[in-house]
Amino acid sequence: YSGKEYFYVVDENHNVTDTLHYGAGQIFHTEIHPEPRLALMYRIDEKSSVKASYSRTVQYAQVASAATGGLPFDVWFPISPNIKPQTCDQFAAGYFRNFKDNAIETSVEVYYKNFKNVIDFKDNAMTYGNVLIDGELRCGKGRSYGVELLVRKNVGKFTGWISYTYSRTLRTVPDINFGKEYRSPYDRPHNFVIVLNYDFTPRLSAAVNWIYNTGQPVTFPYGQYTIDGVTYVVQGS
């Protein structure tokens, strides 16, 4: 590719202050971030143990969801002078115990995640055909927490597992929901899964899967207005 690309520089008030041009082979933006990890395990006895872990992850491409004309769509943004990479610090701990000579496994795990540099479109963002779309983004923070329960049977003709997860994912971003904490698009609190397998013969088996998930959060519009013949939807909180 031998063409040129341009980039709009946005200030802290989300106004365009400059336009930068880049040629083929020219470095656009560079960032370096460490991603440390730590995992610990303590064996209580032959049947039970506890585990704890910490990890930091960095995401160099983020997605923001918007709705134009009532249709939702996602926009991916690479890091740039306007958009910092998203960082996540995750803490997790769990208790694990086996029964009946390790034929049945059980576990309880809890986790907490702290997000920084989370991007999202501001309320009533102008996204359709907007070449200055970076100015419609806002950057904030987020948090996620949950508990996971699991029972698994690995031995015998009848095997399978049952799991339940309760989790929340929340964000706080300026100019969205009046600056108050709100549910992220990934906030689906309940997840319940049942997987059952039965072996009739070495060559014949049957399986049943059942999954229940909480639906994604939705914001319903409460009004609309028209400017120059174009109708815009006003979203609720």
Regions found by a protein language model. Give the residues of each.
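Transmembrane beta-barrel strands of outer-membrane/channel proteins
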Residues: 1, 52-56, 74, 95, ...
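Signature of Gram-negative outer-membrane beta-barrel scaffolds
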Residues: 1-48, 60, 71, 176
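Outer-membrane beta-barrel translocator domains and adjoining extracellular loop/strand segments
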Residues: 3-12, 34, 63-71, 76-78, ...
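Short sequence motifs at beta-strands and strand-loop junctions characteristic
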Residues: 26-33, 82-87, 116, 139-143, ...
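Residue-level signature of outer-membrane beta-barrel architecture
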Residues: 28, 32, 42-43, 56, ...
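Hydrophobic, lipid-facing positions within transmembrane beta-strands of outer-membrane proteins
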Residues: 34-40, 79, 89-93, 145-149, ...
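Membrane-embedded beta-barrel scaffold of Gram-negative outer-membrane proteins
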Residues: 43, 51-55, 59-61, 65, ...
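Gram-negative outer-membrane beta-barrel transporters
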Residues: 111-114, 131-222
